[in-house]
């Protein structure tokens, strides 16, 4: 980000925040190569080294200064040569540079807003597992939940128009339209849903920026409605790209209001609605009446229809009671369960039995989808019976065990937050037995003969890491107690969830 600041200052005074001239700067493509999501494009697809790739960029910039070389007809073939290279690659190089240039002012704006508010970043909250402790703290006291999937834009122009208030120069809009419409014309037979998937794979940096800004526009309604509902003068929240910044700003606002409006502090510490999002899936939850939740639902529907031109039926957004329905989020089925307890109280000669009911959040592993995924990867059949992995049978014993261990370790690492570990143990059992069958297949033996020859020590590595983690949590407990430990463990080093 410091590199962004240095380079942008060189052009800001002359170009007045215009982004279009930045695509003629070589350092933009250098930043795209170093920082890009698709940094291997210029190397792997062409077989050139870094110097040759930068030479291609210099030649492209030289040709762009010449007349009519930036505009390519949509009717041309994909294999029209430009400097001897594929036309798709040419557009991809330019789109990478354009994506970097359009990211710079928004990133700098975000950093400046954080410095003004003096917000301390907490890197632990970047973990997606930090959402579940939030669920445990808040959701037992809530009544209703609604899971909402943010719709994809149905037209390319919507992606362009979301930037109209933030980018000043019209040339950048025309260039963005050129990338989107030209690519869409090349793939005119592809449906819009498949086109979005294809575009996200071919131009990930540009797609992620456009989609994140699109989601940011969608989430702006929550700040607007919060201001209208509270009847208090709140400072503007600006553009928030990450959940941690949104959460931190809300906390900072609570501290400010604590000095000026002490009587209304509870309104912000215990807000009337909670909103959590990961990628395109969001959760709305509240302890108010269904009427209040329905108002929020229609706010969202009218926002989609009037601002994004996306038609959505109200019946597709369901409002459910947390005590009766579970919701799926980040690989877990979660619901609020009533946990009854009986306490015997004695006062002098009289004794009383007090029944107490507490709400507790349950997080359950979706065992059936996981078994389907394992069956698709040929670790088991559709019924969950382990089978061998013939593709790996040609590898060494160490590589086979290491591959199974890596998969088992990742699943155990992510799903250790489950309330019921039986499903997790079943998945690990499938992987262990599949590993044994693969080794037995390689050595042309049966499972029983193979285990008799090597002993059960061959599978002890599957348990080693989990015991080490539990020993850190319960350092004074015996190994037997550690094995019987069934508490939930949330890790703060998981940054993404591969769906």
Curated annotation (Swiss-Prot):
GO molecular function: RNA binding
Family annotation (InterPro entries): Domain_X, Maturase_MatK, Maturase_MatK_N
Gene Ontology biological process terms from the UniProt entry: mRNA processing; RNA splicing; tRNA processing
Pfam families documented for this protein: Intron_maturas2, MatK_N
One cellular component term from this protein's GO annotations in UniProt: chloroplast
Subcellular location: Plastid, Chloroplast
Keywords carried by this UniProt record: Chloroplast, mRNA processing, Plastid, RNA-binding, tRNA processing
Family: Belongs to the intron maturase 2 family. MatK subfamily.
HAMAP family: MatK
Described function: Usually encoded in the trnK tRNA gene intron. Probably assists in splicing its own and other chloroplast group II introns.
The name this protein goes by in its record: Maturase K
The species this protein was found in: Gymnocladus chinensis (Soap tree)
């Amino acid at each position: 980000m410091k590199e962004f600041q240095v380079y942008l200052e060189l052009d800001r005074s002359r170009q007045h925040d215009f982004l279009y001239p930045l695509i003629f700067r070589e350092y933009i493509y250098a930043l795209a190569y170093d920082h890009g999501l698709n940094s291997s494009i210029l190397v792997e697809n062409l077989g050139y080294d870094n110097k040759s790739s930068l030479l291609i960029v210099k030649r492209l910039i030289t040709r762009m200064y010449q007349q009519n070389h930036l505009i390519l007809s949509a009717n041309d073939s994909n294999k029209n040569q430009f400097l001897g290279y594929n036309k798709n690659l040419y557009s991809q190089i330019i789109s990478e540079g354009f994506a970097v240039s359009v990211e710079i002012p928004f990133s700098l704006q975000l950093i400046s807003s954080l410095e003004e508010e003096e917000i301390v970043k907490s890197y632990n909250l970047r973990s997606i597992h930090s959402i579940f402790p939030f669920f445990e703290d808040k959701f037992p006291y809530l009544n209703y939940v609604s899971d909402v999937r943010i719709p994809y834009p149905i037209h390319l122009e919507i992606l362009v128009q979301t930037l109209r208030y933030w980018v000043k120069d019209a040339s950048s809009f025309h260039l963005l339209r050129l990338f989107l419409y030209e690519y869409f014309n090349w793939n005119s037979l592809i449906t819009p849903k498949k086109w979005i998937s294809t575009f996200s794979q071919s131009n990930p940096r540009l797609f992620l920026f456009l989609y994140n800004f699109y989601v940011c526009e969608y989430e702006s309604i929550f700040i607007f409605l919060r201001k209208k509902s509270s009847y208090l003068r709140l400072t503007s929240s600006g553009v928030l790209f990450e959940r941690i910044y949104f959460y931190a700003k809300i906390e900072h606002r609570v501290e400010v209001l604590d000095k000026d409006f002490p009587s209304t502090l509870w309104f912000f510490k215990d807000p009337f609605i909670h909103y959590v999002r990961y990628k395109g899936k969001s959760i709305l939850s509240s302890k108010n009446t269904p009427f209040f939740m329905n108002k929020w639902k229609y706010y969202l529907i009218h926002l989609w229809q009037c601002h994004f031109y996306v038609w959505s039926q109200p019946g597709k957004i369901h409002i459910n009671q947390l005590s009766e329905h579970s919701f799926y989020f980040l690989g877990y089925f979660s619901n609020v369960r009533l946990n009854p307890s009986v306490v015997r109280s004695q006062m002098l000669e009289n004794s009383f039995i007090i029944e107490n009911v507490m709400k507790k959040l349950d997080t359950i592993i979706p065992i059936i989808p996981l078994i389907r995924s394992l069956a698709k990867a040929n670790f088991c059949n559709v019924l969950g019976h382990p089978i061998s992995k013939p593709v790996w049978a040609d590898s060494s014993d160490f590589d086979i065990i290491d591959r199974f261990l890596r998969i088992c370790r990742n699943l155990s690492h992510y799903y250790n937050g489950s309330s019921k570990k039986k499903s997790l143990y079943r998945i690990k059992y499938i992987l262990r037995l599949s590993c044994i069958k693969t080794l037995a297949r390689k050595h042309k033996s049966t499972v029983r003969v193979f285990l008799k020859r090597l002993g059960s020590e061959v599978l002890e590595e599957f348990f080693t890491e989990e015991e080490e983690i539990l020993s850190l949590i319960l350092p004074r407990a015996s190994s037997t107690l550690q094995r019987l430990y069934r508490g939930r463990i949330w890790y703060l080093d998981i940054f993404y969830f591969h769906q």
